């Protein structure tokens, strides 16, 4: 089921979907008599690619997901923590991705989202002296796991190794929630992950029986104070935002259908 989910979701992502429609449309126009269908597929692929790569559309798709939980605000010296955060016994940083690149420091091997997650986790952990850090993420056989790479970054930024727990077998968010549940029981946790991923992640962790404080980071569709004409542009960053929105909605649909959230 895991690989079936990955296969199906890949072909429903904006770029593979649009390219498939365009390529099949061209083939039908050039090598078959189904000209009407070919034109329809070409038009559909072009329209969808235009929409997905537009800033306004991508923001409209992603912002409602990212706005589900507010970010943890900047800490002020001497000011007390919120009761919800102060009671957390663990800070859980979910995996995202890294490259095994010899000669590069651990932080430079992390993907942009993984780096944002571990930095936010460290920021929160430093205000919780009695809490421990849990890093999550598997790795290919013979290579460093993602959890271990995150842990190396944490130690390089001053977190004592004895405060870090690794969970290295979860292939997706559902498995990560089960692994963390086995480690912490129902102890309150601060759950750190990318903002658009957090609604589904928090739902899965709560479904597993955990007391979760959502801590979003790495927002891709931050709200702005003013509207600018450039907000109507088309760019590859918009494709990234649209892809994140589609991926997360498909992921939430998958777990909802399986009654996990």
Predicted regions and their residues:
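Hydrophobic alpha-helical segments of integral membrane proteins
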Residues: 3-8, 57, 61-65, 246-253
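Hydrophobic membrane-insertion alpha-helices, especially the h-region
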Residues: 40-54
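Extracytoplasmic/luminal low-complexity segments enriched in Pro/Gly and acidic/polar residues
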Residues: 227-230, 240-261
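A structural signal for short, hydrophobic/glycine-enriched beta-strand patches
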Residues: 51-238, 242
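Extended, histidine- and acidic-residue-enriched regions that form the cofactor-binding/catalytic faces
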Residues: 1, 17, 55, 259-260
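Membrane-interface helix-boundary motifs at transmembrane edges
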Residues: 30-38
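Membrane-embedded alpha-helical segments of integral membrane proteins
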Residues: 1-30
């Amino acid at each position: 089921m895991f690989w079936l989910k990955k296969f199906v979701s890949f072909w429903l992502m904006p770029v593979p979907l649009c390219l498939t429609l365009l390529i099949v449309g061209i083939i039908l126009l050039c090598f078959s008599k189904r000209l009407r269908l070919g034109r329809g597929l070409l038009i559909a692929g072009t329209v969808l690619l235009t929409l997905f790569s537009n800033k306004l559309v991508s923001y409209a798709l992603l912002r409602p997901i990212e706005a589900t939980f507010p970010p943890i605000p900047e800490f002020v010296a001497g000011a007390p923590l919120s009761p919800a955060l102060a009671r957390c016994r663990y800070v859980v940083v979910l995996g995202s991705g890294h490259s095994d690149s010899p000669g590069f420091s651990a932080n430079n091997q992390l993907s942009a989202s993984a780096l944002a997650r571990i930095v936010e986790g460290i920021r929160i952990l430093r205000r919780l002296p009695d809490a421990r850090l849990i890093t999550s993420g598997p790795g290919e056989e013979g290579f460093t796991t993602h959890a271990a790479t995150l842990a190396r970054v944490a130690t390089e930024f001053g977190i004592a190794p004895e405060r870090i727990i690794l969970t290295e077998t979860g292939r997706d968010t559902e498995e990560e929630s089960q692994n963390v549940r086995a480690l912490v029981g129902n102890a309150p946790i601060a759950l750190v992950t990318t903002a658009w991923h957090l609604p589904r992640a928090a739902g899965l962790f709560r479904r597993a029986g955990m007391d979760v404080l959502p801590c979003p980071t790495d927002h891709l569709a931050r709200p702005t104070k003013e509207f600018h004409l450039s907000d109507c542009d088309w760019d590859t960053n918009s494709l990234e935002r649209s892809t994140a929105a589609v991926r997360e909605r498909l992921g939430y649909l998958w777990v909802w259908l399986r009654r996990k959230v």
